[in-house]
């Protein structure tokens, strides 16, 4: 049936109704849903069909016959090939409206109890929605004899060289470009995944926005590092802002960028960052939000939603280096946090000690294993804050929360679909007070949401 409606290679005219979760335009052709990246709501476009399935088809934008008033010219020269951003062609105010609408779409799909009456607050955006990312993680490739660093084109392993990413902090761009020049100067062997040869796979550069400290991580196929001393000396001479040089070994066939072994090459083993007057040490593998300016906004919204009293205890699930929990520690009687990465827990403990915070307890493990264990031991928290990965809450953790729900909960989500799915369960024991979206990643389709929940 679908094959008769539309064929691969066919050119069709479409009216775009809305944007999908990846920022792509959505239209209907003879009742078949068509996804067209780059198209905007209220536009009339021509698209060429590239993929057909029984339930939907995908197309590439050929021309815009009637443009939306919110369409703007993307300032990035590689915007259409890079795949890192999805919304540069949409005016920023409209991006904020879209992110609130995404949340509405997800709730409509999963229909948690009473969802039509949820309070959805306006998305909090940035004054300057550019140059916000504190970390660049660029793949390396030898192209025509030259080392290039960049990102893979969407759904491919085709590298798009990038020497000025408009959403990156300028400090990371400067360091990245200098490192690429040095790799070329020293003619170091770049990893080739087809031949499984070479050494240098990826460069990671992270900057502490408040401190100006920069960390460089060379991600390599093996522990080998030809001309290591020369490279370190050159970085010292040309990039005095770099205070930490590390090497991470990733020799497995996996989509994970980093491996388990991290080697210290020079300087400090971590860099400092400040959020809400709390100082954090960031080691190479430690998770830390990519937009520190909006992270402060996000966590302040979380703190406000929790409304902790001095006698209350709180669990910081998925705690990372302790960013949320340490921001809460002043207001709470005790904070307990957990994370699966031992280095992150080490950082969280160190951060607490350095700040003189004595009312925290950090443990290595999953929230779904540790929370039931703590419940059995008699620790019954008054509040819990969860900041899970994009996959949402683990089923075992949800079960534990449904059995013994703390009286207050804040859910910080980076994926509106898994949030809406989890709210179906959480709404059985919690009232959803409000949802506050925060734009952590301007120019992309991603959005963070703070949800305030109170036990029924």
Swiss-Prot record:
**What residues form the catalytic site here?**
414
The TRAM domain is annotated at: 5-63
Concerning Pfam families, the annotation shows: TRAM, tRNA_U5-meth_tr
Binding-site list for [4Fe-4S] cluster: 76, 82, 85, 165
Q: Which Gene3D superfamilies does this UniProt record tie to the protein? A: 2.40.50.1070, Nucleic acid-binding proteins, Vaccinia Virus protein VP39
GO MF terms here are: 4 iron, 4 sulfur cluster binding; metal ion binding; rRNA (uridine-C5-)-methyltransferase activity
Identify the SUPFAM superfamilies for this entry. Answer: Nucleic acid-binding proteins (SSF50249), S-adenosyl-L-methionine-dependent methyltransferases (SSF53335)
Which terms are listed as keywords in the entry? 4Fe-4S, Iron, Iron-sulfur, Metal-binding, Methyltransferase, S-adenosyl-L-methionine, Transferase
**What are its E.C. numbers?**
2.1.1.-
Binding residues for S-adenosyl-L-methionine, per the UniProt record? 289, 318, 339, 387
User: What InterPro entries does the annotation carry?
Assistant: MeTrfase_TrmA_AS (IPR030390), NA-bd_OB-fold (IPR012340), SAM-dependent_MTases_sf (IPR029063), TRAM_dom (IPR002792), U5_MeTrfase_fam (IPR010280)
A Gene Ontology biological process in which this protein takes part is: rRNA base methylation
Alphabetical list of PANTHER family matching this protein: PTHR11061:SF45, RNA M5U METHYLTRANSFERASE
Q: Which family does it belong to?
A: Belongs to the class I-like SAM-binding methyltransferase superfamily. RNA M5U methyltransferase family.
Task: State what protein this is by name.
Answer: Uncharacterized RNA methyltransferase EF_2706
**Phylogenetic placement of the source organism:** Bacteria, Bacillati, Bacillota, Bacilli, Lactobacillales
């Amino acid at each position: 049936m679908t094959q008769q409606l539309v064929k691969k290679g066919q050119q069709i005219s479409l009216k775009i109704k809305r944007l999908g979760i990846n920022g792509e335009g959505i239209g209907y052709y003879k009742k078949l849903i068509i996804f067209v990246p780059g198209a905007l709501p209220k536009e009339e476009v021509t698209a060429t069909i590239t993929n057909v399935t029984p339930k939907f088809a995908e197309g590439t934008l050929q021309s815009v016959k009637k443009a939306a008033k919110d369409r703007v010219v993307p300032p990035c020269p590689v915007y259409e090939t890079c795949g890192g951003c999805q919304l540069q062609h949409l005016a920023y105010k409209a991006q904020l409206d879209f992110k609130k609408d995404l949340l509405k779409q997800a709730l409509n799909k999963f229909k948690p109890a009473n969802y039509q009456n949820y309070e959805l607050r306006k998305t909090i955006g940035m004054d300057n929605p550019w140059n916000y990312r504190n970390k660049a993680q660029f793949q390396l490739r030898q192209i025509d004899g030259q080392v290039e660093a960049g990102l893979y084109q969407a759904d491919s392993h085709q590298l798009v060289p990038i020497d000025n990413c408009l959403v990156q902090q300028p400090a990371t761009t400067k360091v990245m470009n200098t490192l690429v020049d040095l790799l070329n100067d020293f003619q170091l062997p770049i990893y080739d995944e087809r031949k499984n040869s070479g050494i240098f796979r990826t460069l990671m550069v992270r900057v502490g926005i408040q401190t100006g400290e920069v960390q460089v991580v060379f991600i390599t196929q093996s522990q080998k590092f030809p001309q290591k001393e020369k490279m370190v000396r050159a970085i010292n001479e040309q990039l005095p802002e770099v205070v930490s040089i590390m090497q991470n070994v990733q020799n497995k066939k996996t989509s994970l960028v980093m491996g388990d072994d991290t080697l210290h090459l020079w300087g400090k083993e971590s860099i400092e960052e400040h959020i809400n007057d709390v100082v954090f040490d960031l080691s190479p593998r430690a998770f830390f939000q990519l937009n520190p300016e909006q992270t402060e906004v996000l966590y302040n919204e979380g703190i406000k939603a929790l409304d902790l009293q001095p006698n209350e205890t709180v669990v910081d699930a998925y705690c990372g280096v302790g960013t949320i929990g340490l921001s809460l520690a002043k207001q709470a009687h005790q904070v307990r946090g957990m994370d699966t990465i031992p280095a992150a827990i080490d950082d969280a403990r160190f951060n607490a000690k350095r700040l003189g915070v004595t009312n925290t307890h950090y443990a290595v493990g999953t929230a779904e294993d540790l929370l039931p264990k703590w419940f059995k031991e008699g620790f019954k928290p008054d509040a819990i804050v969860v900041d899970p990965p994009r996959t949402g809450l683990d089923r075992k953790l949800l079960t534990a929360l449904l059995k013994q729900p703390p009286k207050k909960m804040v859910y910080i989500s980076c994926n509106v679909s898994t949030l809406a799915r989890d709210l179906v369960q959480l709404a059985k024991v919690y009232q959803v007070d409000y949802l506050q979206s925060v734009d952590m990643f301007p120019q992309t389709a991603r959005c963070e949401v703070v949800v305030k929940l109170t036990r029924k």
